[in-house]
Amino acid sequence: STKKILLALISILIFLNATEYQLSTHILDINSGQPASNVKVELYNLDQNRQWVKISEKFTKKNGRIADFLPYEKTENRSFGVYKLKFYTKDYYISHKVDSFYPFIEVSFELLKDQKHYHIPITLSPFGYSTYRGS
């Protein structure tokens, strides 16, 4: 029917216009065993003067993820250089009535020209954290 064809065309157009993102993050609270939702995360770039410049601020979703840092549409538009993510963990733990040692966590990393996507996960507890390059 015409409705089905129209819906299929709309779906294809949405898919073709979907923005891809070069950087994502995920926070898992290993104290509770749950994703850490509503955590403020700031993204900074180290400029040519060796100064940190804030380029984005987002909050983790219910699943503890932010999937949409650094949008790009073509290979030549990929960002590269030194970046850092700043996770406001104390605010998260205050909202859960838990004492925490770290007021925030900063993770610095380098994006290379030849890499498509970077994922920076954090496993977090009130008195420790771990991170790695995910996929």
Where are these regions (language model features)?
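Sec-dependent N-terminal signal peptides
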Residues: 5-15
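N-terminal secretory signal peptides that target proteins for export/translocation
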Residues: 1-2
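Compositionally biased low-complexity segments at domain edges in trafficked proteins
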Residues: 115-135
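Beta-strand-dominated extracellular/periplasmic modules and repeats
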Residues: 19-110, 119-121
